[in-house]
Amino acid sequence: MSLAVFSPCDVASKLLSEVVGEKYPKVDDDDSIVEPVTSLCLPQLSYEDFHHFSVIPLWNKTFPCRLATEWNPKNKKDAPPKKKNALVILERVASRSNQNAVSRVINILRSKVHLMFSSSNELPSSEDVERWKKSPETLAASEYGCNLFIQFLKEQTSENEVDFWLDCQKFRSSKMSSRQNEARRIFDEYFAMGSPKKIYIERYLWCVVQAYLVNDPGWRHTFDVAQAYVGLKLAKKSHKKFLEDPLYLDLVELVTSGVNYNKFWHDKLE
């Protein structure tokens, strides 16, 4: 699809007129069918659902049947509404520069068997773990807490969608010189036919992303709407749910028990 457009909103408007008429657009060559674009299975939209309020006008252009109210404060000093718990923590994870340490912690957290053989100095203190209960922000301040939460999100939703959201967030701050190649990498990894990490979205939205890739000057907005679409699927009170999840509760029991770490997990796994 080739569109002679000059702004992201122009892309959305043009595609809407071309695609919205399809009753059941196809997603892939396997003839999978998705819901019509006019009946997206998403919750009621509010400010807190969007990672950046600047994305809302573009979202409304793309999905006029699922409008979100734009934030127009009467006073410039008014604080913006709080974002969804998960978005606060995801943004912190995406901004971290030490990705090797992040990956190492995630590998430890993937299974209790790995954690069983980890050393005590790789674990947070009981005070740190208790502090995570205060708010999403205090959890986000902990690298270990962030990555435990990411593992929780992946188990609750989709690993590929969480990875896609994080890649999009890092893409937003990427250098202009590398943005074209990075945009192509993200598209190939999450949208290309046959990709093992492919995320499944509306055919219409897939076309929108493809059009941004070709026509968006600077590629700054290429994945804005797709990232928002994935973010809308995350539970609004995910911080509370995380604190009730066995992944967190088991860690609390471990760091507060004062027993030998290996013995603790040996007993848990029997």
UniProtKB/Swiss-Prot annotation:
Entry keyword set: Developmental protein, Signal transduction inhibitor
Q: Extract one GO BP annotation from the record.
A: negative regulation of signal transduction
Q: Which PROSITE patterns does the annotation name?
A: RGS
Q: What happens when the gene is disrupted?
A: Sterility and embryonic lethality.
**Gene3D superfamilies, A to Z:** Regulator of G-protein Signalling 4, domain 2
Q: Mind telling me which SUPFAM superfamilies this protein's record contains? A: Regulator of G-protein signaling, RGS (SSF48097)
Stretches assigned to coiled coil: none
Q: Name one Pfam family in it.
A: RGS
PANTHER family named among the record's database cross-references: REGULATOR OF G PROTEIN SIGNALING, RGS DOMAIN-CONTAINING PROTEIN-RELATED
Q: What does this protein do?
A: Shown to have a role in viability and embryogenesis.
Q: What is this protein called?
A: Regulator of G-protein signaling rgs-10
What organism is this sequence from?
Caenorhabditis elegans
Q: What is the lineage of its organism?
A: Eukaryota, Metazoa, Ecdysozoa, Nematoda, Chromadorea
Q: Which gene does this sequence derive from?
A: rgs-10
